C-alpha cells in the first residue's frame, strides 16, 4: 500500500537522480521511507536513493516492492509545474500507480519486478580520501573537462592540501585544484583515479543542485558521491568504477 503527497520539485529531483544512471528500478516502500538501489546496464555505476517519510506532505505505506519505468516517470514529471503537489496512489488490484497533480491524473502500469535486476550489494571498498565539495563547483569542473577529453582524473594531493580534477586531451590540458578555503572539508589522503566523463556529466547535472557533495576516493578505485536532497530528508549515493589508465 502506498498513498502519499509530495512537492512536485522534490519528486522531480528524486526521479532525476535515478534517471541519471538507469531507466527502470525496483522501488521499495516501508512505513517510514521509500528507497531504491540500482546498477546501470554496463555494471559501471550504481545509484542508491532514500527518501524519508518526512520529505512528504503526507505519507502512508506498507512494506512492498514496485517496478518503476523511470524513463516514463521522467516524461510525466516534465508536465508538473512549480508549486504543484503530487499525489501518489498505489492501485494494488490493478498493479498500477496513479499520479495526480495540477488537474492531471495519470495511471501507469508497473513493471514486473521479476524482470528488473535485483538490488546490487554495495561493494566493501575502503576509500580513505574524502573531500566535501560544493555541488555546482563539481559540476562546472566536469563540464570544463568534457570540452577536451572523454575522461577525467579525480584526486587528493595531501601535500598541497587540495582536491583536484584534471583532464588531458590530445593537445589540451585542464586542471582545477580546490584548496581548504574552497572546500567544505578535506581528509588529506593520497588518492587518484580516472573516470568516464559521460557518466560524470549525467551525475554532475544532479549534483549541481546540492549545497555540498561528499567525494570518497582511493588510488585506482571507484569514486563514491554522497549528497542530500529534499531539504535533508533524502539521500543519494552514486558509485562509479574507474577507467584503467594506459601506461
From Swiss-Prot:
Gene Ontology MF terms: DNA binding; DNA polymerase processivity factor activity
Entry keyword set: DNA replication, DNA-binding
GO aspect biological process, one term: leading strand elongation
InterPro entries documented for this protein: DNA_clamp_sf (IPR046938), Pr_cel_nuc_antig (IPR000730), Pr_cel_nuc_antig_N (IPR022648)
Domain of life: Archaea
Alphabetical list of CDD domains matching this protein: PCNA
Keyword DNA-binding: yes
SUPFAM superfamilies with a match to the protein in the record: DNA clamp
Pfam family of the protein (one): PCNA_N
Record-linked HAMAP family: DNApol_clamp_arch (MF_00317)
The protein's assembly and partners: Homotrimer. The subunits circularize to form a toroid; DNA passes through its center. Replication factor C (RFC) is required to load the toroid on the DNA.
Family the entry assigns: Belongs to the PCNA family.
Function noted in UniProt: Sliding clamp subunit that acts as a moving platform for DNA processing. Responsible for tethering the catalytic subunit of DNA polymerase and other proteins to DNA during high-speed replication.
Protein name: DNA polymerase sliding clamp
Amino acid at each position: 500500500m502506498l498513498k502519499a503527497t509530495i512537492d512536485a520539485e522534490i519528486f522531480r529531483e528524486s526521479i532525476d537522480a535515478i534517471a541519471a544512471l538507469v531507466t527502470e528500478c525496483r522501488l521499495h516502500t516501508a512505513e517510514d521511507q521509500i528507497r531504491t538501489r540500482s546498477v546501470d546496464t554496463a555494471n559501471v555505476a550504481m545509484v542508491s536513493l532514500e527518501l524519508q517519510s518526512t520529505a512528504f506532505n503526507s505519507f502512508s505505506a506498507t512494506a512492498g516492492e514496485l517496478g518503476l519505468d523511470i524513463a516514463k516517470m521522467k516524461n510525466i514529471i516534465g508536465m508538473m509545474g512549480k508549486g504543484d503537489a503530487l499525489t501518489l496512489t498505489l492501485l494494488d488490484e490493478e498493479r498500477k500507480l496513479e499520479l495526480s497533480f495540477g488537474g492531471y491524473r495519470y495511471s501507469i502500469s508497473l513493471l514486473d519486478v521479476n524482470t528488473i535486476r535485483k538490488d546490487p550489494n554495495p561493494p566493501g571498498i575502503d576509500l580513505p580520501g574524502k573531500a566535501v565539495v560544493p555541488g555546482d563547483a563539481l559540476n562546472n569542473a566536469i563540464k570544463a573537462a568534457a570540452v577536451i577529453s572523454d575522461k577525467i582524473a579525480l584526486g587528493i594531493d595531501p601535500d598541497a592540501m587540495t582536491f583536484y580534477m584534471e583532464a588531458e586531451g590530445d593537445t589540451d590540458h585542464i586542471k582545477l585544484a580546490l584548496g581548504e578555503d574552497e572546500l567544505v572539508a578535506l581528509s588529506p589522503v593520497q588518492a587518484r583515479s580516472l573516470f568516464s566523463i559521460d557518466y560524470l556529466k549525467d551525475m554532475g547535472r544532479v549534483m549541481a543542485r546540492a549545497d555540498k557533495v561528499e567525494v570518497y576516493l582511493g588510488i585506482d578505485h571507484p569514486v563514491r558521491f554522497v549528497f542530500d536532497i529534499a531539504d535533508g530528508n533524502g539521500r543519494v549515493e552514486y558509485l562509479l568504477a574507474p577507467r584503467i589508465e594506459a601506461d
